[in-house]
Amino acid sequence: MATESVRVRDVLRIVGEVAAYRLRRLEMANMAGAAGIAVALHLPPADCAVRLCFAFGLNLLVYLNNDYLDLADDLLAPGRDDAKTRFLRDHRRAGLVAQLGLVVVLVVGAALVMPSLLLPLALGGGVCWAYSARLKAMPGADIAAMIAWGAAMPLVGSPPELALGWALVGWLGLFSGAFEGIQVIRDHDADAAAGVRTTAVALGVGRTLLLVRVMLAASAVYGALVVSPWLAALPAAAMLVPLDRSAPRPSGPGVDATRMWNRVRLLLGLAFLGALAWVWWTGSTHGVLVQVSRATVLG
């Protein structure tokens, strides 16, 4: 069997297609979170630019790794056996080289310019790899991993010694857990058919939906205690968003989580934008339990 050669243009094509596909699907929202946190913390413009570039590179790495590890499943999934997926299948070594290249660029770049970025690289990249390789098929661990990932990725936007950055990404982590719950509800039928044991497959749609509402309640409580009781009303309102259980589908009536996903995303997005605006304007959160300011340094 001939050894597959690796061409630079194949590597660049794979990276470019990952970027285009994920940006088109609005799946790099953590970049906006990182950029918003950096601006809210009043970091210098050059600092913000470095962090945004790093966030983009980190997103390329984790999503390419996800596509690489999910390749076999994607080829069988409806609508995913496209030219992009087939190209990655036919150029696996180029996909591996692309990942290694991104790791080198991110590690060297962070070490030379901003060593503190190695922390979100290790946390975000490590959690995403573990999720794609194993945790996504472990009930409970799939949602826990996305809570950790949802906090780790936007941590790019904050120096790790600033308590305010941690307070904000903690809220995003809870949001991410709720979104993962909705996602596994959406994918319940396909995962069950493929033998993938997610939280929704293990618990069923009804109990997973209850878990999503519990996580939204936790987000509301966290928001009231740490961020703002007024903004906490938005994740509380998200608890009331219904799940469409009778949507028409090719296989007949069933559960369609798309509408719920979009409505919850709108409410939680507005909550976080409000938090960023408040922090940018006042320099502090305004929770009923704690107020974390830009001047608060850990340790």
Where are these predicted regions, by residue range?
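Membrane-embedded alpha-helical segments that form the functional core of polytopic membrane enzymes
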Residues: 32-68, 117-129, 164-182
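Acidic (Asp/Glu-rich) catalytic motifs at the cytosolic membrane interface
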Residues: 55-82, 176-199
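Multi-pass membrane catalytic core of lipid/isoprenoid biosynthesis enzymes
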Residues: 71-116, 196-228
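Intramembrane alpha-helical segments
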Residues: 10-13, 83-164, 244-246
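Small-residue-rich segments of transmembrane alpha-helices in multi-pass membrane proteins
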Residues: 29-37, 143-160, 200-205, 259-279
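Extended hydrophobic alpha-helices typical of membrane-associated regions
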Residues: 12, 225, 230-299
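C-terminal ends of transmembrane helices
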Residues: 63, 67-68, 72, 126-139, ...
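Functional transmembrane core segments of multi-pass inner-membrane proteins
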Residues: 38-46, 143-192, 206-219
